[in-house]
């Protein structure tokens, strides 16, 4: 029985298009081959040809690297639940499906050009369709992580800490615990949420530099999506629970300690320790500000960011939420996401401009009134 040549399974025009795409990508940067599957910008096309493209092809042509990143993230979450061994997998799968539907509804409307991507509505819908599902998925991790597995690896994480560092900050700093020190670090631990909100809102709603927005967006989404997926591989409760009998001094403080405790109990995923997002996200912001210090606002904010980041990182261990290895993992994640976002967006921005595809992000600008309006 004769075997069919695999190449005969592909339409000739499709092969020619992919050949042209490979040549263009290789000409831009060998790194682009890694992402050649994600952005099928086979060749520049004129406006008339673009308008005649079917809706599905417009969506596919206009997708950005971060759109693929989030799609992979939610599919991976869903598969982890499907093959998980914990309770309430059906409800967790439903929640992930809703998140994915929110993402792709926005992509279908904006990337499919049902509304103009550069318009206020298009820009706003795209931003919401990216960040709202990721935020929802974090809140849902409280149910998703137990649905994937009931195990906790605190013993293994602690053993690794002791082998690598011969030091566990949560235990070593126990003699330093007082209401005053607890409140100090609680303030900075809680400031993480404000820092996250300020940075995201500033870049997504106020910033005008398209490339800068895209770099920030891809990087911070990579940080959160990677962390959420690794939580399923390395679940743990942290020293506050696993080492509860090892502490002599109880954590107690004022307003900020109560705020931290209530927030963690109400919305925390509980087994989300490796890597530390309280380390990764502020570190990413700090690296981003340093890299783009040619912008005055980022140059001025860098020292403040660096100080807050250092205190937030110390707080994660002082307040007994994280082991030292969690911090190392968070620093590594932030550094890799930052460097990768710079490389991806340098390539993607050039490729989209070359092939006549709209930028990943458009500045969010309010609609202007007509000339005759006052």
Name these PLM-found stretches:
Residues 11, 22, 32, 38-45, ...:
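N-terminal transmembrane-helix/juxtamembrane module of multi-pass inner/ER membrane proteins
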Residues 74-82, 134-136, 224-231, 307-317:
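Aromatic-anchored segments of alpha-helical transmembrane domains
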Residues 122-130, 197-235, 305:
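Interfacial segments of alpha-helical transmembrane regions
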Residues 139-155, 223-250:
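Transmembrane alpha-helix/helix-exit interface in multi-pass inner-membrane proteins
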Residues 181-196, 269-290, 324, 328:
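Membrane-interface loop-to-helix entry segments
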Residues 229-294, 299:
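Membrane-interfacial catalytic/cofactor-binding modules of polytopic membrane enzymes
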Residues 238, 273, 311-336:
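Interfacial helix-loop-helix junctions of multi-pass membrane proteins
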């Amino acid at each position: 029985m004769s075997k069919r040549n695999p190449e005969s399974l592909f339409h000739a025009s499709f092969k020619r298009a992919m050949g042209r795409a490979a040549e263009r990508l290789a000409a831009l940067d060998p790194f682009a081959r890694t992402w050649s599957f994600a952005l099928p910008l086979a060749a520049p096309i004129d406006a008339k040809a673009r308008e005649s493209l079917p809706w599905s092809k417009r969506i596919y042509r206009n997708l950005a690297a971060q759109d693929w990143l989030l799609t992979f993230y939610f599919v991976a979450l869903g598969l982890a639940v499907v093959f998980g061994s914990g309770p309430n997998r059906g409800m967790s799968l439903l929640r992930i499906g809703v998140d994915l539907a929110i993402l792709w509804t926005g992509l279908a409307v904006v990337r499919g050009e049902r509304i103009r991507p550069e318009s206020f509505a298009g820009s706003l819908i795209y931003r919401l369709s990216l960040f709202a599902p990721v935020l929802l998925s974090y809140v849902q991790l409280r149910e998703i992580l137990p649905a994937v597995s009931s195990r906790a690896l605190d013993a293994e994480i602690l053993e690794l800490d002791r082998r690598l560092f011969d030091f566990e900050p949560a235990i070593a700093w126990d003699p330093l615990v007082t209401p005053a020190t607890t409140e100090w670090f609680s303030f900075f631990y809680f400031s993480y949420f404000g820092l996250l909100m300020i940075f995201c809102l500033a870049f997504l709603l106020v910033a005008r530099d398209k490339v800068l927005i895209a770099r920030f967006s891809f990087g911070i989404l990579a940080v959160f999506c990677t962390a959420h997926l690794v939580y399923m591989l390395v679940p743990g409760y942290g020293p506050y629970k696993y080492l509860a009998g090892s502490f002599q001094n109880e954590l107690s403080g004022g307003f900020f300690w109560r705020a931290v405790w209530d927030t963690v109990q109400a919305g925390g995923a509980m087994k989300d320790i490796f890597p530390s997002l309280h380390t990764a996200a502020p570190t990413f912001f700090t690296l981003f500000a340093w890299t783009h210090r040619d912008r005055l606002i980022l140059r001025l904010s860098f020292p403040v960011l660096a100080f807050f980041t250092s205190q937030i990182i110390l707080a994660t261990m002082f307040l007994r939420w994280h082991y030292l290895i969690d911090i190392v993992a968070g620093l590594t994640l932030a550094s890799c996401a930052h460097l990768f976002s710079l490389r991806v967006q340098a390539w993607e921005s050039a490729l989209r401009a070359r092939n006549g595809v709209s930028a990943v992000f458009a500045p969010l600008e309010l609609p202007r009134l007509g000339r005759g309006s006052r």
